[in-house]
């Protein structure tokens, strides 16, 4: 699970950056 956290943060960051 912990290995998924950086990917989730990356995805959220990309979405936030797109907004």
UniProtKB/Swiss-Prot annotation:
<comment type="function">
    <text>Has antimicrobial activity.</text>
</comment>
<dbReference type="GO" id="GO:0005576">
    <property type="term" value="C:extracellular region"/>
</dbReference>
<keyword id="KW-0878">Amphibian defense peptide</keyword>
<protein>
    <recommendedName>
        <fullName>Phylloseptin-J6</fullName>
    </recommendedName>
</protein>
<keyword id="KW-0964">Secreted</keyword>
<comment type="similarity">
    <text>Belongs to the frog skin active peptide (FSAP) family. Phylloseptin subfamily.</text>
</comment>
<dbReference type="GO" id="GO:0006952">
    <property type="term" value="P:defense response"/>
</dbReference>
<keyword id="KW-0929">Antimicrobial</keyword>
<feature type="modified residue" description="Leucine amide">
    <location>
        <position position="19"/>
    </location>
</feature>
<keyword id="KW-0027">Amidation</keyword>
């Amino acid at each position: 699970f912990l290995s998924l956290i950086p990917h989730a943060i990356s995805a959220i960051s990309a979405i936030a950056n797109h907004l």
